[in-house]
Amino acid sequence: MALRCPIVSVLGHVDHGKTSLLDKIRRTRVTQREAGGITQHIGASEIPINTIKKVSKDLLGLFKADLSIPGILVIDTPGHEAFTSLRKRGGALADIAILVVDINEGFKPQTIEAINILKQCKTPFVVAANKVDRIPGWNSSEGPFILNFNEKNQHPNAMTEFEIRLYENVIKHLNELGFDADLFSRVKDTTKTINVVPVSAMTGEGIPDLLVIISGLAQKFLEQKLALNVEGYAKGTVLELKEEKGLGKTIDAIIYDGIAKTGDFLVVGNPDGVLVTKIKALLKPKELDEMRDPKDKFKPSKQISAATGVKISAPDLDNVIAGSPLRIVPKDQVDAAKEEVLQEVEEFTILTDDEGIIIKADTMGSLEALANELRKVKAKIKKAEVGDISKKEVIEASSYASTNPLNGLIISFNTKVLADAKVEIEKSDVKLLEGKIIYKLVEEYEDWIKEMEELLKSDEINRLTKPAMIKILPNCIFRQKEPAVCGVEVLYGTLKIGSPIMSEDGKKLGYVKEMRDNQQENIKEAKVGMQVPVSIDGNIVLSRNAKENDILYVEVPEPEARKLHHEFKDELRGDEKEALSRYMELKQKIENNIFWGM
């Protein structure tokens, strides 16, 4: 029975070394080209069986492994939790997975999340305990770990430290999550125990062991799943839409089942539903070359078989969305394939809110991941689309902001901002957040929301009437009325220009027209402890309805007093709280209503 390559997914926490580990196998340098050191798109690399046998020759006899699979196809799935959706897709597509864990740092939230995804997808996995070279005293060298793990090559203290870190940082956590696990060389029953393979992406130690374990497990337990479908049509997923010289727009895709031929029809999801177009060429990357950024040109193939990464050249691909499902079929099967693809596309619909922000991304998977992460921080999303940011979206966001300033935001993941949109943003009140790392965009969103909420709160507080108690100073009545001018001391709170003033018996006296400091300069407010001359315009007649040593209050309307008491109390100074408390007690007494302001 012919077997296809098992599809291998690599998951793990950010910076634990997923791409660097593959880098050691592929001999390329993908990691250094990725934004923020995080792999942002699902990539694919074929590792042929000859390469696996070559780097693992010392182990094949030791493990009595007879590998008959044609190789392995590695999907490099992003490791940060922001890419839950892409990882789910990667996990679901994968036959087996490598979970990368830093043996020195142990499990992180993203590690646990990755395990949960693998559980949901029922995908078997092996743990790569990376960075053994950083264990104090460890003598790490390229080649099999199992041949380096002995007292001849390692100091006893380093061996002890290795065992401690292996258990405390890896095995113990797996046990807590319900898995039996052990160092791969000690595993007796691979159906019940997780294999932990120590590796170093830096030196290459343990890479042969990892390849043998992955290949052997896939071949032993997934033989039926790996049986090549020699008659069925090809099924796959779009990774990226790319412009290629001499070819125009092309699709990079993973084919996970069936066979495709040049001249067949491509059925793929797009914004209008489904696109059907005739394939001009099927192009494959050279083995061990990374599809996202190949160093050499692709080679044409008349026929390809799963599992493989492929570049597809065909007409009318401009609007194809990355992450879309695809089928490659002969003409008589186009209608059936259209139904399948349409059904899958509909599953990608992102639910939107009646009000909220606009989010844009370069792929369906990224858009879904961005939306999911924003939902976790309680963001409301009015519009979510794949594609560049246009003037139309800026105008829409501006209209959203007119009803709620917190909605005047566009978040762009890995997309372009068109020229007319840039012009519109400059003259509008719309905020644009751009980035190539989703979790950082979410952090920026949270910072912006916090900043905006504080600004809006500050604006609202400033619009409210601030409470204050003042005392008319003796021998400081300078004018009796129209306006009355006298010296006052602020006992509690903040006295502002325009503040309405009332007496202790609740009579309206007027409002503060003017205040001056010791240098006779006009001021807008006076805080607790200040003694200032003020002019009060209104019904006040000094020495008649307001006298020396009288206590006067700033009159705060009940709705504003209630707001200050319930919503903004923490924003008030201690003396302002005291002024509000005394004022509310006075009003409750005057109005004969103990619930006044409550």
From Swiss-Prot:
Q: Which domain of life is it from?
A: Archaea
| Any one of the GO CC terms | cytoplasm
**Any one GO molecular function term:** translation initiation factor activity
Q: Pfam families from the entry?
A: GTP_EFTU, GTP_EFTU_D4, IF-2
Give the residue ranges for region: G2: 37-41
Q: Where is this region: G1?
A: 12-19
User: What protein family is recorded?
Assistant: Belongs to the TRAFAC class translation factor GTPase superfamily. Classic translation factor GTPase family. IF-2 subfamily.
Region annotated G5, chain positions: 200-202
Using the UniProt annotation, give all residue ranges assigned to the region (G4). 130-133
Q: Can you name the source organism?
A: Methanococcus maripaludis (strain C7 / ATCC BAA-1331)
Q: What does this protein do?
A: Function in general translation initiation by promoting the binding of the formylmethionine-tRNA to ribosomes. Seems to function along with eIF-2.
Keyword flag Metal-binding:
no
Region (G3) location: 76-79
PANTHER family of this UniProt entry? EUKARYOTIC TRANSLATION INITIATION FACTOR 5B, TRANSLATION INITIATION FACTOR IF-2-RELATED
The molecule here is called Probable translation initiation factor IF-2
Chain positions recorded as GTP binding sites: 12-19, 76-80, 130-133
Write out the entry's keywords from A to Z.
GTP-binding, Initiation factor, Nucleotide-binding, Protein biosynthesis
- Keyword DNA-binding belongs to the record: no
Q: Please state every residue range assigned to the domain named tr-type G.
A: 3-225
